[in-house]
Structure formats: structure tokens, C-alpha cells
Regions:
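Structural micro-motif
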Residues: 15-25, 34-35
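Short amphipathic alpha-helical segments embedded in low-complexity Lys/Glu-rich regions
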Residues: 2-4, 25-27, 143-144
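Non-heme di-metal
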Residues: 47-372
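Thioredoxin-like thiol-disulfide oxidoreductase module
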Residues: 1-19
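Non-catalytic, surface beta->alpha helical segment in thiol-disulfide oxidoreductase systems
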Residues: 26-46
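Alpha-helical interaction elements in eukaryotic regulators
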Residues: 7, 33-36, 229, 266
Length: 372
């Protein structure tokens, strides 16, 4: 066995023309073995600039996928003033929403604004300073700005329903909520390995930690309740799905440029991040349902859905599934979100967001598969 580089070099000197397999090619140029690639990796990354290097010029693009995602994201731009919440106020104050449902919605809204604050701060503090390539930085900046819109939209909903300002820090009184925020914000990007793990966690933050709340709020849409709130959720889902797509691609590009960080321990840490995210969601779901169930959605269904969506996120990162939930346990989500207009649930299926030309359906939230 050729167990080390010295033995391999000695073998190749004795056997001219011998090559190990597989042989690596980049743009039809023969690089050689994995060891040969590692010897020239830094040179190759430096030649194209790399994710962590300032772009010398606007073009040529080295990460055109980031430009494409940014363009699509900006075409989906919206602001909180576009949302009509008048019917929500009538639902809330006119008896259409029960006391159990009010407590349920309030618990979700207590955390939602702060969750988007955490996500936005992560972009500004963890990622924008590190990723200096212009295409990627523009993508991250676009994502960060949209989180500000999410914050204002959910804050507007709180205020329109008459919830006091004290609700903005009420989440601190509940470990089920405070622990989620701690998880979302705790990262160490001081090393390449830590930066890679932080990118993976960002996919869990936006693609898992927010989605239980999305489902719990969007359920009211099915019964003609809180339709303005439902619109905010629909547009947020479109945004977060694009963010997850972009951050997953960034994670894989970063790992490709720094392959030495990707080992068994690195992958195991990501699986543990995913499992911990699910545990936190289970606790939060139990809190939301503490006063009882709501029409059309059981706590157990939300928990199963979170396992389903977590497996989809692992696939987007290029990893294997963990919970083995292959089918969406809430098929009504696809029906609700793939409609053409947001009018009355009983007359029309709910939304296809078309502001600035965005089209597409719920399945796009899961469409980015693994890379072998």
C-alpha cells in the first residue's frame, strides 16, 4: 500500500507513466491526483479571486449563480406597506379568532420579529465581512436587506392587532423562545471550518427554524382567517426559500475551495446542528399548543413536517437525510401556496406572488438537490 506521499513518489519514480485513479481535470486541463490538486489549490483559488478575496473588477463573474439568485430575489421585492391587514383586525376583534387561537398566534409572533433580527444580524456580522467577492457579497447584502422588511412586516402585524411593545422582549421570558434565538446567533467564523459550519447553520436558521412558524400561521389561511397575515407569510416563504438556495450554493462553493475542512467530524457537526434545531422546534411547538389545539393542525403534524423540511435542507447542503421523512406530511401546504391569487380560500387557491414578476410554487422551497 502507498500509505504516504514519500512512498507514492518513490513508486511513481520507479514506474514511469504510472497514474493513480481517479485523475482530476479542470476545464480539460490535467491536474493529476488529489495530492496534486492540493498542491495547486491555493494557486487556483487565488487565480480566480476566491470567495474571500475582493473582486478586482465587476466582470468577469466567477460565481454567476450568485448574480442569478440576486436578480431573482430582487424581482420578488416587496415592502410591508403592500399588505392589507384590515380584515385581520376584524377577525381578531370580531370573534372569528378564538382565545386559544389568539394565544397561539401571539406566541408565534412574539418570536418571529426577533428571529428575523437574528438572521439579519448574522448576515451583517458573520458573512458580509468574510465573503468579499462582489457577486456573493451583493447576494448576501440583498438577503440581509430583505430581513429588515420581514422585521417591519411582522412588527406591523403586531401593532395592527394591538399587541403592546412589551411583546417584543416577552420571548426572553420563555426558554423555548430564548434558546432558539441563542442557537440562531451562536457561531464562530474565526476559522475556515467555523465559517463553513456557520453557513450550514444559516440554512437551518432560515430553512428550518422559521418554517414551523410559517406553517402554524399559514394554517389560518385555509379557513379564511387572518388573510393579511397569510400574505406576509407567503411572501416570507418565497424569500427564505431563495435565501436557503443561495446559502446552500455558497456553502458548497466554500467547501469546494477549502476541501480540507470537509471530513467526517465536519459532516457529523452539521448533522448535530440539524438535530438540535429540530429539538428546539419541538419545544417551541409544544409551547405554542399549550392552551390546546387549533382547527386543522395538530402539534404532531407540525413536528413531523419539521423533520421532513430538515431532511430537505440536508439534501440541499449535499448531505444525507437524517429523519427519513420522504413525503410532505402537510400536503395542503402545496395546494394553498400554489394557487394564483390571494382572495377567498373557498373561491380560489392562495397566492402566486407576482410582484415584479416572481412566479413559481411551493415545491421550489425543496427543489435544490444534493451534489455528489
Amino acid at each position: 500500500m502507498l500509505d504516504n506521499e514519500e512512498q507514492r513518489l518513490e513508486f511513481y519514480q520507479k514506474v514511469p507513466g504510472a497514474r493513480s485513479v481517479p485523475q482530476i481535470y479542470i476545464d480539460d486541463k490535467h491536474i493529476g491526483t488529489y495530492d496534486d490538486l492540493m498542491r495547486v489549490a491555493d494557486t487556483l483559488v487565488k487565480k480566480i479571486g476566491g470567495l474571500l478575496e475582493f473582486s478586482e473588477t465587476y466582470k468577469p463573474f466567477h460565481y454567476p449563480w450568485a448574480v442569478d439568485i440576486t436578480t431573482r430575489h430582487e424581482k420578488a421585492h416587496w415592502i410591508e406597506d403592500e399588505i392589507d391587514l384590515s380584515e385581520d383586525v376584524t377577525d381578531w376583534k370580531g370573534g372569528k379568532i378564538t382565545e386559544v387561537e389568539k394565544d397561539y398566534i401571539t406566541n408565534v409572533l412574539r418570536l418571529f420579529t426577533q428571529s428575523d433580527v437574528a438572521v439579519g444580524q448574522n448576515y451583517y456580522d458573520q458573512f458580509v465581512p468574510k465573503f468579499k467577492n462582489n457577486e456573493v457579497r451583493n447576494m448576501l447584502g440583498s438577503f440581509a436587506a430583505r430581513e429588515g422588511i420581514h422585521q417591519r412586516a411582522y412588527a406591523l402585524l403586531n401593532e395592527t392587532l394591538g399587541l403592546p411593545d412589551s411583546e417584543y422582549h416577552a420571548f426572553l421570558e420563555y426558554s423555548e423562545m430564548a434558546d432558539k434565538i441563542d442557537y440562531m446567533m451562536k457561531s464562530d467564523t474565526s476559522t475556515m471550518r467555523g465559517l463553513g459550519l456557520s453557513l450550514a447553520k444559516s440554512v437551518m436558521n432560515e430553512g428550518v427554524a422559521l418554517f414551523a412558524s410559517f406553517v402554524m400561521l399559514l394554517n389560518f389561511q385555509r379557513f379564511g382567517k387572518m388573510k393579511g397575515m397569510g400574505k406576509v407569510v407567503e411572501w416570507s416563504i418565497r424569500d427564505e426559500s431563495i435565501h436557503v438556495e443561495g446559502n446552500s450554493k455558497l456553502f458548497k462553493a466554500f467547501c469546494a475551495e477549502h476541501p480540507r475542512i470537509v471530513d467526517a467530524d465536519f459532516k457529523q457537526d452539521i448533522y448535530e446542528l440539524a438535530r438540535h434545531a429540530v429539538k428546539l422546534e419541538d419545544k417551541f411547538i409544544d409551547l405554542a399548543y399549550k392552551m390546546g389545539t387549533v382547527e386543522g393542525l395538530e402539534a404532531a403534524e407540525v413536528k413531523q413536517y419539521i423533520r421532513y423540511i430538515t431532511d430537505r435542507r440536508l439534501l440541499q447542503l449535499g448531505l444525507r437525510t437524517n429523519f427519513k421523512v420522504k413525503e410532505n406530511p402537510l400536503p395542503w401546504l402545496e395546494w394553498v401556496l400554489n394557487g394564483a391569487d390571494h382572495t377567498n380560500f373557498f373561491e380560489n387557491r392562495v397566492t402566486e406572488y407576482e410582484v415584479a414578476g416572481l412566479t413559481g410554487g411551493w415545491e421550489e422551497a425543496y427543489s435544490q438537490g444534493a451534489v455528489s
